[in-house]
Amino acid sequence: MPRPVSATPAPVAHVVLSSGFSRRYTAGVREFAVEAKTLRDVIKEMDRRYPGLGEYLEEETTVAIDGEIHEVAYYQPIRQGCEVFFIPKLEGG
């Protein structure tokens, strides 16, 4: 009898929001453990937990993964234990 194939669990990322985002969307909670394979998955999970947050993260932030800033990071892979930090975009002038 063949053995069932088990799906590989997604890595768990340490997600950090700025205090402004957390006050607006998560009642002040700034840090989260999120199971995800890509940054897109992180954003979708954050939006599932806090409706409306995903769109805001996509449009109004830049993201740093383990200290490296990514302007376009939607499909960046997530590694176990990595830190994902959402940074407010700076407006030029």
Residue spans of the language-model regions?
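Ubiquitin-like/PB1-type beta-grasp interaction modules and other compact soluble beta-rich domains
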Residues: 1-92
